[in-house]
């Protein structure tokens, strides 16, 4: 078993059973290709999402260190911050969130609805900043201040994307390979690539478990030149901690995130509407809508290796739909 070293890392059970892997018959008919979806949007805490996989490892480490406060950072509409705050509430921990407004909007829905509304329900301490220009340093500065107030803080990086957090997606690869036993000739896996932990964890896991399957990361905030080093750095760090080699190339498509992170575009919104209309599945304007736009266009442009089935990793994010109204 190439991933047996995963068991060395403490893990807090937050998700329980594997998330569903489903066939999408109407979308498949529409696109002329078998499409499957991994439903990490339906993880069981606070409207779901992929970050719970990372938090199982990160929060286990925080508890091992005796922390009473989780500190993290992200955009006002960050799904990661929402899930971190929910886990903190569930465990009786304090949560401090350092937030930025990456799109510079004054729209009330964006500033107060969606994920931001949920942060208040979880009694999160909000700290605003002009921009997360150096989030690791900014989080450490905040942690020092919180510690001086008598708390025992644990810093969780943006997106939960450290080598430890990304172990959650190495583990996800184990679920995927088991659930895909009946999927004949799986060709490709498509995932949104942002803070890079989900992408890197899958890259390590799938390289060892499904080496013939192509993994495509659709960027949501950066060009390939900017994103690829981030994914590779995490890929190598994860592999090092698991005593594995990681030689698989990192495949990225950067054609679908413009005009920038957190700003909806037409192709992404059309993908959101298409999945809702055909399958009753809710994507979001920031991550999964743009990743699905890449999948759809990739089929049209024949960018995939072959014509086999494609698996889409649904990382969640639907609460942001309310914040982005009336774009939706």
UniProtKB/Swiss-Prot annotation:
Catalytic activity, EC: 4.4.1.15
Residue numbers bearing the N6-(pyridoxal phosphate)lysine modification: 51
Reactions it catalyzes: D-cysteine + H2O = hydrogen sulfide + pyruvate + NH4(+) + H(+)
Keywords: Lyase, Pyridoxal phosphate
GO biological process, one term: D-amino acid metabolic process
UniProt xrefs under Pfam families: PALP
Role noted for this protein: Catalyzes the alpha,beta-elimination reaction of D-cysteine and of several D-cysteine derivatives. It could be a defense mechanism against D-cysteine.
PANTHER family: 1-AMINOCYCLOPROPANE-1-CARBOXYLATE DEAMINASE-RELATED
Protein name: D-cysteine desulfhydrase
Species in which this protein is naturally found: Salmonella typhi
Encoding gene per record: dcyD
